[in-house]
């Protein structure tokens, strides 16, 4: 049985909340710690505990972000991926896909709860639905993409950070 939740608790124009997370490399980071330093693309997606088509969607997102990472780095934009898997599962996932960006574990779903990220529970595993945020250097949420699909996502978020003209 699959169940879903929804209801974002933040909106465009809000400050990114203060939420601490641990990356697969053990690095601890509060989302607010980048304020004043870098713009941020923050993407929640289903990770290694999903199976079948849901896993394929998560893998596609991880790979799309991997492809975009050099461009983001060149433009001075931080990229953080977040799944609700534990650190051990994520370490294997990062190694398997060769992900160059920080992937944070929200196993206790603290960030998911604070931001109101939709989740899906399947076979006892609760995973974040694909949701992406563009955050300005001053910490303001510039864009939110719910049910985010990999194609065109990074371009849309970069346009929010660096508007044309």
How would you describe each model-predicted region?
Residues 1-165:
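Chalcogenol-based redox active-site neighborhoods
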């Amino acid at each position: 049985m699959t169940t879903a939740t929804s209801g974002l608790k933040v909106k465009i124009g809000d400050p990114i909340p203060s939420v601490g997370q641990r990356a697969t490399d053990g690095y601890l980071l509060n989302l607010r710690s980048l304020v004043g330093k870098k713009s941020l693309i923050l993407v929640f997606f289903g990770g290694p505990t999903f199976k079948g088509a849901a896993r394929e969607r998560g893998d596609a997102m991880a790979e799309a972000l991997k492809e975009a990472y050099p461009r983001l780095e060149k433009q001075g934009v931080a990229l953080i991926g977040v799944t609700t898997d534990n650190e051990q599962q994520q370490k294997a996932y990062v190694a398997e896909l060769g992900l160059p960006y920080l992937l944070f574990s929200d196993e206790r779903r603290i960030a998911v709860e604070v931001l109101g990220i939709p989740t899906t529970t399947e076979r006892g595993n609760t995973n974040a639905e694909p949701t992406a945020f563009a955050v300005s250097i001053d910490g303001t949420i510039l864009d939110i993409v719910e049910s985010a699909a990999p194609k065109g996502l990074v371009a849309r978020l970069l346009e929010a950070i660096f508007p044309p003209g």
